[in-house]
Amino acid sequence: MPLVQIQHLGGAFTREQQTELIRDITDAFVRVSGEGIRNNVLVTMTEIQSGLWATGGVPLTIEEVERRRAARQAAQG
């Protein structure tokens, strides 16, 4: 039975977005393996507190995530 564990910065995704991710991940397994696998796909989401996630030794905060998201959206037009 597939187990997908997702860790993300708390506040980076709304509850609706988290639910959509869970549904889409489950649907991906169904597309590959067939409908019979649906009830056996386990997806967990763990929120990591802002500032307790680091890349290259630099803590990542929700404010930085929002800044990056805004910059990406601005670049897309």
Model-identified regions with their sequence ranges:
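A domain-level signal for the structural core that forms small-molecule/cofactor-binding pockets
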Residues: 2-77
